[in-house]
């Protein structure tokens, strides 16, 4: 199992209150349940199951009800959208990546990119270079993410 998969599973378990993490770097994980009420293997499999992840991706990203300080949102106004995604995922402890594909002839391809945050895939954007496609996809993802966050004053 890769580190990325383990992190996703741990943060999924944390959201469901089965484990908690320390503020150390890297975090230390502990269970929140007594020995007699520990979840079974089938409970953990249901959380990690890829099918449930696919279903959650179709929920229009409304599960991102994160609380972000207003200072961060003001700062993000003039920052590159890729930087915003990176900082957002650091604050919320989420994994993220780009999915990039190339279409067309090798001498003038069109690149398509989309942002994947914790298994939730955002809208696809195109560009003449990978960098342009990433920036365009990040802009779309930031617009959608910031429409669902809760601002803390």
UniProtKB/Swiss-Prot annotation:
Domain Z-binding: 1-33
Signal peptide start and end residues: none
Highest rank taxon of the organism: Viruses
SUPFAM superfamilies: dsRNA-binding domain-like, Winged helix' DNA-binding domain
SMART domains assigned: DSRM
Keyword match Metal-binding: no
GO MF, one annotated term: RNA binding
Similarity annotation: Belongs to the orthopoxvirus OPG065 family.
Protein name in the entry: RNA-binding protein OPG065
């Amino acid at each position: 199992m890769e580190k990325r998969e383990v992190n996703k599973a741990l943060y999924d378990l944390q959201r469901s209150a089965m484990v908690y993490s320390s503020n150390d770097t890297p975090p230390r994980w502990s269970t929140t349940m007594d020995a007699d009420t520990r979840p079974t293997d089938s409970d953990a499999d249901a959380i990690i199951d890829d099918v449930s992840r696919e279903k959650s991706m179709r929920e229009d990203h409304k599960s991102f009800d994160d609380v972000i300080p207003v200072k961060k949102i003001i700062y993000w106004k003039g920052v590159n959208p890729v930087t915003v995604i990176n900082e957002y995922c650091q604050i919320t402890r989420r994994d993220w990546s780009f999915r990039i594909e190339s279409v067309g002839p090798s001498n003038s391809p069109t690149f398509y990119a989309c942002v994947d945050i914790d298994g939730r895939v955002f809208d696809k954007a195109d560009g003449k270079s990978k960098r342009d496609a990433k920036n365009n996809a990040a802009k779309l993802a930031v617009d959608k993410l910031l429409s669902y966050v809760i601002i803390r004053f």
